[in-house]
Amino acid sequence: MEPRAVADALETGEEDVVMEALRAYNRENSQSFTFDDAQQEDRKRLAKLLVSVLEQGLPPSRRVIWLQSIRILSRDRSCLDSFTSRRSLQALACYAGISASQGSVPEPLNMDVVLESLKCLCNLVLSSPVAQALAAEAGLVVRLAERVGLCRQSSFPHDVQFFDLRLLFLLTALRTDVRQQLFQELQGVRLLTRALELTLGMTEGERHPELLPPQETERAMEILKVLFNITFDSIKREVDEEDAALYRHLGTLLRHCVMLAAAGDRTEELHGHAVNLLGNLPVKCLDVLLTLEPHEGSLEFLGVNMDVIRVLLSFMEKRLHQTHRLKESVAPVLSVLTECARMHRPARKFLKAQVLPPLRDVRTRPEVGELLRNKLVRLMTHLDTDVKRVAAEFLFVLCSESVPRFIKYTGYGNAAGLLAARGLMAGGRPEGQYSEDEDTDTDEYKEAKASINPVTGRVEEKPPNPMEGMTEEQKEHEAMKLVNMFDKLSRHRVIQPMGMSPRGQLTSLQDAMCETMEGQLSSDPDSDPD
């Protein structure tokens, strides 16, 4: 049914005609997400008519059908202005049961009305900054948090619980003030951790499910997404003992999520959200990933249960096969594995054995091949600086932050970016709590070590001498041509001569020489100022 015909029916005011027109429109457009520009003005007119009645108050018999029509039109950005008034948003919040102005004992809720209202609010908040601001001002997060906290006692159906969480996710993703309010005033981490525990069936006395059902999977992922939003900067925050205990408890739930299978084909998606949130936890709280006791069937390494680390490594390898959005898919799991390896020697040695086994193939460049090491070395020269940084950091930590060992496995050319950023171009080792474990060399590596090109990280055939057969005069002529070419490039600032500063960082040759001379003068006791 055309929007003009529906609008005409609404203007008649005859209830039977109005409801029949709206039912037909809803039925025909329930799956419409794009709209014809030619009918834009008709849809705007229809939206205004729907909103005017919504703001005055809908009789119970009309609410579901009316809200369904509003939900469909709220997908159309050209109609948003009609729906984003303070009165219309307040009306939707009241029908959803999340208005702060409602009394402590609100009227009984019709769950179909609640669900349609929540869907309308989600559409509006997603698409309209005005709706986002009005929702924040109205304090919808307070009632949403109350409902999430009552999920065990409430008789709300799955769809309502899910869209409560979806609206909470959108508000915390799009509004900093709502994020802070949920985190600080409403104790969002504690509240949502408890909700996650209940959703996963992890409470005392309950048998832990081996396969998470579809509805619980959907709700768990929404909870993880909201937790990610409100803990986004907690990794940078100092936490006291009470908060650390809470984050460790959350970490145990995330560990369970990583080990859990989800119904259908959503296991990797669930694991992805859990890994993203693990990356937000304070580093000292990640020790819970390695506190599972070894048991029959578990992977034990140096007396430690490595099941979680193995799953995370397998998850990372799957993500490496993706060719798009590597930053979102690979960086979080690499960061988590890096911190586990940095803090825990058994985890580092296990990961090194899997990722950087003793070198045998010394004739292939480190970035060539389909081994996990090859894939990670390729990421070290990725266009995205965050991707190459986390990949290099992970391999560097697996090498116990030893520069020679890092160069051995990756080649100096691939390693140069991280070494320059760390001020380690001159070698050395940063401060770190690493044991002096030996890096066992294979016989193949020992035999070829002297012939390995440190820049490429492989044995290369000796190239022919380009000056072979030239006279001394010809050699001198070619050398001067080369000098003149470099001089021209330098004078036109196409290239800049670089040197190594005393701190091990690349800098201009002139600055490097000045710093070196200043260092020598300051360390010479016989030197006096002029």
UniProtKB/Swiss-Prot annotation:
<feature type="modified residue" description="Phosphoserine">
    <location>
        <position position="435"/>
    </location>
</feature>
<dbReference type="GO" id="GO:0001965">
    <property type="term" value="F:G-protein alpha-subunit binding"/>
</dbReference>
<dbReference type="GO" id="GO:0005886">
    <property type="term" value="C:plasma membrane"/>
</dbReference>
<dbReference type="GO" id="GO:0005737">
    <property type="term" value="C:cytoplasm"/>
</dbReference>
<dbReference type="Pfam" id="PF10165">
    <property type="entry name" value="Ric8"/>
</dbReference>
<comment type="similarity">
    <text>Belongs to the synembryn family.</text>
</comment>
<feature type="modified residue" description="Phosphoserine">
    <location>
        <position position="522"/>
    </location>
</feature>
<keyword id="KW-0344">Guanine-nucleotide releasing factor</keyword>
<dbReference type="InterPro" id="IPR011989">
    <property type="entry name" value="ARM-like"/>
</dbReference>
<feature type="modified residue" description="Phosphothreonine">
    <location>
        <position position="440"/>
    </location>
</feature>
<comment type="function">
    <text>Chaperone that specifically binds and folds nascent G alpha proteins prior to G protein heterotrimer formation, promoting their stability and activity: folds GNAI1, GNAO1, GNA13 and GNAQ. Does not fold G(s) G-alpha proteins GNAS nor GNAL. Also acts as a guanine nucleotide exchange factor (GEF) for G alpha proteins by stimulating exchange of bound GDP for free GTP.</text>
</comment>
<dbReference type="GO" id="GO:0044183">
    <property type="term" value="F:protein folding chaperone"/>
</dbReference>
<comment type="subunit">
    <text>Interacts with GDP-bound G alpha proteins GNAI1, GNAO1 and GNAQ, and with GNA13 with lower affinity. Does not interact with G-alpha proteins when they are in complex with subunits beta and gamma. Interacts (via C-terminus) with RGS14; the interaction stimulates the dissociation of the complex between RGS14 and the active GTP-bound form of GNAI1. Interacts with NCS1; interaction is favored in the absence of Ca(2+) and myristoylation of NCS1 is not required.</text>
</comment>
<keyword id="KW-0143">Chaperone</keyword>
<dbReference type="InterPro" id="IPR019318">
    <property type="entry name" value="Gua_nucleotide_exch_fac_Ric8"/>
</dbReference>
<feature type="modified residue" description="Phosphoserine">
    <location>
        <position position="523"/>
    </location>
</feature>
<feature type="modified residue" description="Phosphothreonine">
    <location>
        <position position="442"/>
    </location>
</feature>
<keyword id="KW-0597">Phosphoprotein</keyword>
<dbReference type="GO" id="GO:0007186">
    <property type="term" value="P:G protein-coupled receptor signaling pathway"/>
</dbReference>
<feature type="modified residue" description="Phosphoserine">
    <location>
        <position position="501"/>
    </location>
</feature>
<dbReference type="GO" id="GO:0005938">
    <property type="term" value="C:cell cortex"/>
</dbReference>
<protein>
    <recommendedName>
        <fullName>Chaperone Ric-8A</fullName>
    </recommendedName>
</protein>
<dbReference type="GO" id="GO:0005085">
    <property type="term" value="F:guanyl-nucleotide exchange factor activity"/>
</dbReference>
<keyword id="KW-0963">Cytoplasm</keyword>
<dbReference type="InterPro" id="IPR016024">
    <property type="entry name" value="ARM-type_fold"/>
</dbReference>
<dbReference type="InterPro" id="IPR008376">
    <property type="entry name" value="Chaperone_Ric-8_A/B"/>
</dbReference>
<feature type="modified residue" description="Phosphoserine">
    <location>
        <position position="527"/>
    </location>
</feature>
